[in-house]
Amino acid sequence: MKKNIYMALALAATLTTTSCGDFLDEYSQDKITATEVSHLDEALLGSVYMPSIAYYNGPSSAYAGFLNIIDDDVNTGYSSMASGSGNSWNTWNSYLSGMFGYFAWQLEVGKNYESGSVESDKRTWEDLYKRINNVNVILDEIVDMPHNTDEKLAAYYRVQGEAHFERAQYYLMLANLYGKAYNPATCESDPCVPLKLTPYVETEQFHRATMKEVYSQIVDDLLKAEDFLTKSPQIDDHRLYRASAEAADLLLSRVYLYMQNWEEAEKKADAVMRSEKVELATIDLLNSKPDSEDYEGADFLTEQNPEIIFSQGSNFVSGAVFDGRTGNYCVAKELYDLYDDNDLRKTTFFEYQTQMDNTPVDSLALAHKYHREQDYRSRVGSIYTLRAAEAWLNKAEACAMQNGKEADACAALNELRRNRIADYADQQYTGTELIDQVRLERRKELCFEGQRWFDLRRYAVCEAHPYKRTITHVLNVPSDKGTYRYSYVYNLEPDDPAYVFAIPSDIQEFDKLEKNPRQKREPVLKGVLIKTEDE
C-alpha cells in the first residue's frame, strides 16, 4: 500500500535543491509517495544529510557553525603595524561584527556589534529538528517497504543504519548546545532538549527531556546504526560522505566519553582501531612542504587524507576569515605555544602572515589544516567530521581513567604522536600527568574541528579529574581607516551559565519550555589600541 510522506517543513526546501533522481521530480514539494527503499534513500540524501556550502564570511549561526569561535583556541587578529587601508574595516563588518554575540558569549547571541541589530538565534535548532523529523518519517515508512531481494535487503538495512546515525549525531549536538554537560550525578534531573521520535505532528506541547533520556536515545540510535551498517556495509565510494559502522562506533566512543563510561568508550574506540578500513595519516603527510603556487599538496584535512571516516556539512574556517589579519579571527597564541618545534602540526596547521600591504601581522593564521581559499566549498566539514585520530585519543583517555590501564593509554598516545612529531621518543606517564597529557594532545590534534568547546564543558564535570578554566576573548575593533579603535576583553569564567545556550526565543515563547539561565555580559576591560591624529 502506498503511503504519503510528509516531510514537515524541511523537505520542500531541501529536496528541490538536490539532484537525487527522477523520484524527487515527480512529486509536489510538500508531499511525496514512496514505494521503494531507494525512494527513502533519496530522501535521506536530500533532507537528512547536511550540504556543503561555501561560507564566504566564515562562522555562521546555521548548522552550529559558530562552535570554533567560542572556545579558547581562537581570538581576533591584531597587527602593531596596522595600515591606513580601509579593507580591515570592511572585513570586520563582514566577518566579525555579525558573530559578535557568539564570540563574546552574549545573552543575545545574534547581536551584531556594529549595528546593534539582533538576528534570530533559532537557525541551528530549527535545522537540526527538521532533519530529525525527516529521519523519523523515513524510519516509520521503511518498515513496510519491500526488501525481498538481496539488493533491496542490503539497502533496507543500510538506509535504516544511516538514519539512526544521523538522528544520533543531531541529538548529540542539540544536547550539548542547549543542555548542561552530561553529569552522571545529575543526569536524571538535568533538563536537555525535547525528544521527538514520531513522524507526525504532536498535539501536546513539547517538554524538555532529561539529559539521561536524550543520551539513552543517542546510544540506542548508534547501536542500531552499528548493527544495520555491519549487516550492510557502506560501499567504499560512499564511505566519506555517508555513515558507516566505523563512523557509528567512533561517535559512540565519544558519547561514552561524555557519559564518563570509560569501559564502553574504550571498547568502541578499539572497534574503530581494529577496522581494516581505518588508518592514521602518517608523518609523511605532514612532512609535505607548502608550495607557494599550489597549497593543495600541503593541506592536512582533505578528501585524500586516509583518516577521514565521515564528513558532512560545511567548513566554516577554511576561508580567509581565519588568516589572522586585521579585522579577522586568529589562532590563540596559547594554543600555538603548546606544540614542540619538532611537531609538524605546528608548521602545517598555523603560520604568521602579512597584511594585504605586506606589513607584519602579530597574529596567527589557521593555515593548512584545511584547504584555505576565499569562497571555497570544502569537502571536509569543520563541525561534523569524524576521523581516525579521535579513536586513538578516545582510547587513550578511556584507559587513562581506568585503574591498571595506564600502559594502554600511553601506547595509544605514543602511536598518534609518532605520526605527528619528528624524531619522537615514546613517553610513559602515570596518574594525573597522564590524564593531562591526553587532554593536551586532544586539544592539539582536534583544534578547529568543533570539539574543544564540548571538551571544556565535560572536563568541568569529570568526577575523576575535574578541570576548569577561564577563557578570555579579545575583540579588536578596527576603524574605517584600517587602524584600531578599541580592544574589548571578555571573560568566560568556570561554571558560567553561558556554557549552555539559551533556548531560541521563538521556540521558548511557543512551547513554553523551561529556560536556560543566561546573563548579559559586559567587557572586563576596554582600551584604545591605536588612535591616529585623524581619529
Identify the meaning behind each predicted range.
Residues D41-F66, I70, A209, E213, ...:
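Extended ligand-binding clefts on enzyme/binding-domain cores
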Residues M1-T18:
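Sec-dependent bacterial lipoprotein signal peptides
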Residues A154, L177-S216:
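Short coil/linker segments at helix-helix boundaries
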Residues I132-V135, Y215, L222, A269, ...:
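Inward-facing hydrophobic residues that define packing positions of alpha-helical scaffold repeats
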Residues Y215, W262, K405-E406:
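TPR-repeat structural position
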Residues S94-Y178, A209, D227-T230, S378-L386, ...:
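Conserved, well-structured interaction surfaces
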Residues C20-S80, A269, L335, Y339, ...:
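Membrane-proximal, proline-rich intrinsically disordered regions
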